[in-house]
Amino acid sequence: MSAEVEEDHRPSPSSIASFSSFEGEKSIRAFSLNPSFDDSESLSSRHTEDPPDFFDPNYANDITWLEDDSPYPEVRSAVANYDDQSMPINTLRAWVLGILWAIIIPGVNEFYYFRYPSIMVTGIVAQLISFPLGRAWARWIPQWKVFGMALNPGMFTIKEHVLITIMAGVGAQSAYATEIIAVQRVWYKQNFNFGYQWMLVMSTQLIGFSVGGLARRLLVAPASMIWPNTLVLCALFNTLHSQSYAGIGRHDGLSRERFFAYAFVSAAVWYIVPGYLFQALSYHSGMGFSLLSFDWNQIAFIGSPLATPWWAEANVIVGFLVFYWFLAPLVYFTNVWCSQYMPISALGPYDNTGKRRPYNLTRILNADSTFDLQAYKDYSPLFLSATFAISYGLAFASITATIVHAILYFRKPIAVHLHRSLAEQPDIHARLMSKYPPVPQWWYAGILVVTFTFSCLCIKLYPTQMTIWALFVALCIALVYLIPVGMIQAITNRQVGLNVITELVVGYMLPGRPVAMMMFKTWGYITMSQAMIFTSDFKLGHYMKIPPRPMFWCQVVATVVAGTVQLGVENWMFANIPLICTPAQKDMSGFTCPNTEVFATASVVFGVIGPTLQFSKGQLYYPLLFFFIIGAVCPLAVWLLTKRYPNSWLNYVNLMFTGVGLIPPASAVNYVPWAMIGFLSQYVIRRRYFPFWAKYNCNLDVLSAALDAGTAISTLLVYFILQYPRNGAIGRDTIQQWWGNTVFKNTADWHSAPLRVVPPGDRFGYVWHCLFFGEICSAAPHSV
């Protein structure tokens, strides 16, 4: 017999009453999702804590710290403050559905990763679709047992749902190490076997988990570490399992499932217009002054604008306006860094003839892929476009700004939480989670030993020019930045990347070794980044009261499955898609590999040529090193001003440098429409209609997930039905040639045309005493 479908009677955050139980205390209290609800009764009987020891832009200053709930309105509106420890979680159903999503979503995302514009299918898609799948499983699967495990454990619970979603999302992003493999294959003509590829991906993806375990006390337990992205998932979990509707009241409106279905179908149908029939609605080039894009691929290229607080989005867009709409044109039209001989915005390197594709690496490399200095002098220095050069300066600034910001704002909370256990946290969620046994430290140590062994095997068994001692240095960099970066991300939903600082360090340590440079960067940067994913998921489990041990294993297993699938997809693509990662794909299916090209350019700048010939004193890009000083001074200046004006808007200034870190491969086209939608949803609606926003904000998250999923599926269908067959010949003389599909290709920006053209046989160059501003370049025969 099959189990009848049962409603999940776990009360939702919008219930009239809830029970909380901890340390022998049992109480019933009324509460509501409505932020205007008066929750001040019996405050005298509650233990109160002081507000955070730093300015927290998410903190509700007008509300006393509540013992049985969070002081953050976003958390109170999305997270329930009780737990049912008897609820099934570690079931066969959860593992089967979770593994299924750990195969599908990473595979789809890896396919899109090499395309422009790309799109990322997030775990919210799995979260939404798993709900009807889980309920169908409860209804139709027989109640048998296999090896002592129930095929059908009964009703589909919210905790099972959380476990499935975590497995779907933990490996959803393209594994960073697959970039190393792609660059080795395309740029350095190295194609090592699958064993090397698998060990490299597993070591870089999992070693961060062992490090992330160290951060739980500081980044998960404190209430101030809200992790805004997890609240999106929490709100949707509670909405789905409480059977709430998209409209007002229980039956006045569409159900979440139907709302998602309508939005999904609409997005899938609409994408055919900008994605195939009228591509001028999608593709733009240059600096993005056209403002609008009608393609969700372009709008969400840097992430959904519906899940980040407006004050953080405002920081990002102000940084974009200052550095890319003001500074970049100023640099370009004054010909700083010889930039007029290149497009204002480009992803790759140029030589001194103004030709970029490709910068001829074979002319400056020895047979073992190491750097030949004399050949480099005989050939050409490496030049970058104005926006690419500025992006390095901003990356330098973000590194020092992160450390200084953490010292100024987070030193007190770090000291407090280092000495505080889960049970001692003044947050109800931490005290509830203290009832579950923690993950043993030797589990983290075991992952570290295995992944470190894989790393050493990759270094010793294959000709990568990497060293074991350099691996230690890379891991130390990740450890140093783990807490500062984590605290910033937990509050702002923006992560500070360590890719450039690791590139700079290894460039000086191991000059002339491009593959070693890419490996060092990946272990130094992705160790920290994966630790953030691990920690973010643990915060989701913290909010949803998931025991830590099942959380740990579902993340590890799903990461192994996802990484293996992504390697399979990548190898298939390079074997079956013609001219992949070449300029010819720009006019075919779009598989130009923009992310990979940026990765390869960095390997040339920092790995082949090295920072000594690019950024040291007397070199062309030496002025960019002053951004390290700028990054250190700016947070200090803002901090001093906030001491003088404690209630001013300056308290919200903190993301100017790192917010635009996705340029390149992103461009202005991706930032402007993203900011416009973010302003509407996170400022206008939230500020003017806060009760409405608090109650229905997760509808925007459902909409975002539906747009992601519908666009992704439609893109796949368009590609495999209309573009992949016959090598793209379908409609070549008809639909592909009409004005709406060609007009955007008739611009100088699209053709990467520079402002100045080097005459045939001439070269441009620079003088040794180059200044940050001024005419330092000239075109003359062999004038390098």
Predicted regions and their residues:
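Alpha-helical multipass membrane-protein architecture
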Residues: 2-784
